[in-house]
């Protein structure tokens, strides 16, 4: 049954809370600033932020539980967060929650659940998964619903400057009536804006490096509407969707009742909590286009500066030969693994056994290997700790391990290399009675790899 429109919902929502942070562990010395692969640059670059850094990782649309693809992304950029902290760099971490969107509304209707309840239930499940995986929470965890009113002046300003336009309504082939007034960003007008004082101006493709034909194909696959009647350019993204019967909507004054488009939401939240360009905009590589590429255009139109200095993306995680996705239903859920008694530290180790930019497939064998690895680490650290104070015992191997782990994670978050170094230390610790430093290794695992023994 269609649900009635809900106007002004944001006034009913409290600010979204994140999850509890894992215990903070400080290591001796200090790491170098990390280098990461910048998708826009097409190479590994030095992240030049020695005073403060900002990180925006696109959040979930909460209509289903956290699957391994989600977990892989948030664990990967948790490693970046930890790399900065170990280098003495404070981090402003922002993450959104798309708690009103078409997939969420469709799932709520299909299951006869109020969309707000569905969003809150799945967001809470996500929080518990992230806490179990020892992911450092964002300083600003922001739902779209709670922040919709911040969008109104942004879109109105784009209108005043001739960068946004309305399209007429129409009836589609299925007989669905689309009313007058949807608002789109005019990409041609945005491209024609003059360069800023630093010489920067935005153009489509600066993040994704795709041809226009490739963009058009992907745009349709990832939530875009290239064939929408009345658009000036097929790639023009939606800014404001005017009210439809049965959908939630918000009274936006001159814009009319409706709800926001996807890309402008992240632009708005990033601008709200970070002064200037983000240090790193991150997410799965399925967000490279259209979300991050066109999102950069939104930021340029709104603020006359680059959205981010760097873009970083994780590879896709699959199961049974296909990308893991909610729509396909081939999901390995973190919550189900936890409910089955699996240690979330082992799940995290299984994820970090793959390089974050690689596409990979989840298997039971990966988890079994990670569980054995975790058992070995716990045993080796315990044995090494038990030797402390004994004659001839030294922590030299642990100190060398700290250097190796820092170097591996500092070079494009190479967690597999870091774990291989811990493996080698564990073998040595179990074979050589002079190897100590167990407490330091415990701290290395907690502080840099997010693994708690």
Curated annotation (Swiss-Prot):
Binding residues annotated for Zn(2+), in chain numbering: 58, 266, 291
Protein keywords: ATP-binding, Ligase, Metal-binding, Nucleotide-binding, Zinc
Residue ranges annotated as motif 'HIGH' region: 60-70
GO CC, alphabetical: cytosol
Residue positions binding L-cysteinyl-5'-AMP: 58-61, 73, 96-98, 262, 284-286, 317
Reaction equation(s) it catalyzes: 1D-myo-inositol 2-amino-2-deoxy-alpha-D-glucopyranoside + L-cysteine + ATP = 1D-myo-inositol 2-(L-cysteinylamino)-2-deoxy-alpha-D-glucopyranoside + AMP + diphosphate + H(+)
Pfam families in the record: tRNA-synt_1e
Assembly: Monomer.
Protein name: L-cysteine:1D-myo-inositol 2-amino-2-deoxy-alpha-D-glucopyranoside ligase
Organism whose genome encodes this protein: Rothia mucilaginosa (strain DY-18)
Encoding gene, per UniProt annotation: mshC
């Amino acid at each position: 049954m269609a649900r009635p429109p809900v106007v002004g919902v944001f006034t009913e929502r409290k600010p979204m809370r994140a999850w509890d942070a894992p215990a903070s562990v400080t290591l001796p010395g200090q790491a170098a600033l990390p280098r990461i692969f910048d998708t826009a640059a097409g190479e590994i670059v030095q992240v030049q932020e020695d005073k403060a850094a900002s990180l925006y990782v696109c959040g979930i649309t909460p209509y289903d539980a956290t699957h391994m693809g989600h977990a892989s992304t948030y664990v990967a950029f948790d490693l970046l967060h930890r790399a900065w902290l170990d280098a003495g760099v404070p981090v402003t971490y922002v993450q959104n929650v798309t708690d009103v969107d078409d997939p969420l509304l469709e799932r709520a209707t299909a299951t006869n659940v109020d969309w707000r309840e569905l969003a809150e239930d799945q967001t809470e499940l996500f929080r518990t998964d992230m806490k179990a995986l020892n992911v450092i929470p964002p300083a600003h965890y922001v739902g779209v619903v709670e922040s919709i009113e911040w969008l109104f002046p942004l879109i109105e300003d784009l209108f005043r400057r001739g960068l946004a336009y309305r399209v007429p309504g129409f009836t589609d082939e299925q007989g669905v009536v689309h009313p007058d007034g949807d608002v789109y960003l005019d990409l041609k007008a945005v491209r024609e804006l003059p360069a800023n004082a630093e010489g920067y101006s935005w153009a489509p493709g600066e993040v994704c490096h795709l041809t226009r034909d490739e963009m058009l194909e992907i745009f349709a696959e990832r939530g875009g509407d290239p064939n929408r009647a009345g658009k000036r350019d097929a790639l023009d993204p939606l800014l404001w969707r005017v009210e439809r019967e049965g959908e939630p909507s918000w009274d936006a004054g001159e814009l009319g009742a409706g709800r926001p488009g996807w890309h402008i939401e992240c632009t708005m939240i990033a601008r709200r909590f970070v002064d200037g360009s983000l240090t790193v905009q991150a997410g799965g590589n399925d967000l490279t286009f259209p979300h991050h590429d066109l999102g950069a255009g939104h930021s340029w139109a709104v603020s006359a500066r680059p959205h981010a200095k760097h873009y970083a993306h994780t590879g896709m995680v699959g199961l049974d030969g296909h990308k893991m996705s909610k729509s396909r239903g081939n999901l390995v859920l973190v919550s189900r693994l936890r409910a089955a008694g699996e240690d979330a530290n082992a799940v995290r180790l299984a994820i970090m056994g793959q390089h974050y930019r690689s596409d990979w497939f989840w298997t039971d064998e990966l988890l079994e290997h990670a569980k054995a690895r975790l058992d070995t680490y716990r045993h080796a650290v315990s044995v090494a700790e038990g030797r402390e104070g004994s004659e001839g015992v030294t922590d030299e191997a642990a100190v060398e391990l700290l250097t190796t782990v820092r170097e591996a994670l500092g070079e494009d978050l190479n967690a597999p290399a870091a774990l291989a170094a811990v493996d080698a230390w564990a073998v040595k610790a179990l074979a050589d009675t002079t190897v100590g430093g167990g407490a330091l290794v415990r701290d290395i695992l907690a502080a840099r790899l997010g693994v708690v023994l």
